[in-house]
């Protein structure tokens, strides 16, 4: 298969869409398919990072970033019309054969997909929102939404194959093996990560909370992403003796697996932690994570701090106090789930079957 993946990263979009597409891209390459990424040169893009990961990337023309005050105004994410974006993609692919177009972009819908489909390609839609129509051959949403099996019936053609639920989660290969070995070498630590861009400064809030506490019965490892705009402010703050501040841990999933507890978002990172059976406190770092966080918290397996736009350092101070009080009796492992780390293999299996 010759696969094109259309995905962006920016200070407003974040890095998560690109990171999960990289998982899919690497699995496709592992199966000896060709992969080309199409990504626009927005502020905070990951084009160079993707190339460092061995990817072939075509950079779409830079534009003047239009940053909406509403982080969830998804149409602003694209920067151009869907028709212009599709035409630029097709022009960039003039000498690149392709039979699959994968896209992971909240600003793209059936209008863009239909223009790409006219080229004879299969369309693979990655979505989390279920808020617009798709003209796709395969629809993917790995979130464990309530009633996830019926979520897209009104938005996709009847002929579209739907890969729904966390068993299809696009996780790096290491999660499958770490899931089996997590019972070994658990460290007395809490690890925290709030996305690559951390738009509402959750890492800074948690660090400020730690500064108000004389001691904790565990270490706190604060991991901030490569695109965190508050890096300078984080580095200026004095660190309590029980805090470690780290930028973009290269072996993050290993450190995650060896931690006893975590703070983090309710998107892909929550699926990663569930795969590892790691207890955690959730924060909705994007509006589309709110429903998911509330749903997971109702299960009784997770604690939910709230929406990141509303959280303060005091929220984290209270949560750390609660953890300290219950630290000795907290379970260090969640019950089994169907998130086994093999989702990327299942996704590529489906693409190969649809191509045969």
Locate the predicted segments by residue:
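Conserved donor-nucleotide binding/catalytic region of nucleotide-linked donor-dependent transferases
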Residues: 303, 308-337, 354
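Nucleotide-sugar donor-binding patch of glycosyltransferase catalytic domains
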Residues: 278-314
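Conserved nucleotide-sugar phosphate-binding/catalytic loop shared by glycosyltransferases and other
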Residues: 31-87, 306
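Nucleotide-activated donor-dependent transferases that construct or modify glycoconjugates
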Residues: 1-14
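C-terminal alpha-helical cap of glycosyltransferases
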Residues: 339-356
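A nucleotide-sugar donor-handling region in carbohydrate enzymes
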Residues: 135-200
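A donor-sugar binding/catalytic signature common to diverse glycosyltransferases
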Residues: 15, 22-25, 250-292
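Donor-nucleotide binding loops and adjacent catalytic segments primarily
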Residues: 184-258
